[in-house]
């Protein structure tokens, strides 16, 4: 079977999406006029994401990238979520495609987007820039709530991060899983093309026998909380994304909102500990600002110099050889 050559370009855009520990938990299949995105459960994070919630949020990020790339290439895309969690995207070449400026602006952000784990420069994001970005991503199912340092929720969320760190850093399964996804040097990173590389973590390029015990010793609540407090203090806002339901459809919808946060040079990084620890997540759900919605993603926003980019597996390695349904 032959496929349009630009289908590979669409998948190239899709795999630039973020994922927990850069696990890249997706696989693709090609049909004559469709692409499917399926969860790759062999890459699931059973300790930090036992319900696969963040896995499906990552698939939503990949889906958004793919659909934006499809529109850029002149395709109309229609998505359908199957019961098994597979997303089927029907693609129809438009004879006279009209490119929408807002879609093109987002498409341009795909290669620029990164999870920036650095300390930010402390400059506030002007509300005149932030408000339209957030408003454009609001929907009937997903809402975005930004809190400046002066808001009481900012302190509440900071404390939730601290509590989440304390829970996770005292969980041997969490730490073992995290260590398994750390790539300790350039050779290690090049061999797997996934995981959390030493470079994106701001660590030196050292042999694993040196860096592994150092990083293992650093995985403790005191050090993590000190680091996160400083990074939160350097940020302009904390952003909590919530949804009306807690199921794969709304998790996908949540993921589709994240690319927009790259606009105007805004940096972002995940502080999702309180959404990952059940007790903390239940407390966040009680925040009046959420209006009864379910918290899905917590990020910090601000400005920072770009960090090294995480690697991605080659496109051919994430495409199944069987025909898409």
Which stretches of residues belong to each language-model region?
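Acidic, surface-exposed loops and disordered segments
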Residues: 1-325
């Amino acid at each position: 079977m032959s496929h349009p050559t630009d289908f590979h370009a669409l998948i190239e855009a899709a795999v630039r999406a973020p994922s927990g520990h850069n696990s890249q938990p997706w696989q693709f299949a090609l049909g004559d006029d469709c692409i499917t995105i399926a969860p790759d459960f062999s890459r699931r994070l059973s300790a930090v994401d036992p319900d696969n919630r963040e896995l499906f949020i990552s698939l939503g990020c990949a889906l958004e990238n793919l659909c934006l790339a499809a529109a850029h290439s002149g395709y109309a895309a229609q998505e359908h979520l199957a019961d098994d969690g597979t997303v089927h995207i029907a693609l129809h070449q438009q004879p006279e495609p009209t490119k929408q400026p807002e879609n093109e602006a987002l498409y341009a952000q795909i290669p620029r987007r990164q999870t920036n784990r650095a300390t930010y420069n402390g400059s506030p994001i002007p509300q005149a820039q932030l408000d339209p970005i957030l408003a454009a991503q609001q929907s009937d199912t997903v809402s975005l709530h930004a809190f400046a340092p002066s808001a009481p929720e900012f302190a509440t969320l900071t404390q939730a991060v601290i509590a989440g760190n304390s829970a996770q850093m005292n969980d041997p399964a969490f730490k073992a899983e995290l260590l398994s996804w750390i790539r300790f040097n350039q050779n290690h990173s090049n061999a797997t093309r996934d995981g959390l590389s030493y470079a994106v973590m701001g660590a030196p390029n050292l042999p694993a026998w040196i860096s592994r015990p150092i990083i293992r010793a650093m995985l403790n609540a005191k050090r993590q909380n000190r680091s996160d407090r400083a990074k939160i203090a350097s940020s302009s806002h904390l952003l909590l994304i919530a949804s009306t339901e807690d199921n794969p459809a709304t998790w996908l919808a949540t993921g589709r909102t994240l690319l927009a946060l790259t606009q105007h040079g805004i940096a972002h990084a995940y502080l999702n500990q309180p959404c990952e620890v059940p007790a903390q997540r239940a407390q966040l759900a009680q925040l009046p600002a959420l209006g009864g919605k379910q918290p899905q993603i917590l990020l910090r926003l601000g400005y920072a110099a770009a960090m090294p980019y995480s690697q991605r597996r080659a496109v051919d390695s994430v495409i199944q050889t069987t025909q898409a349904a």
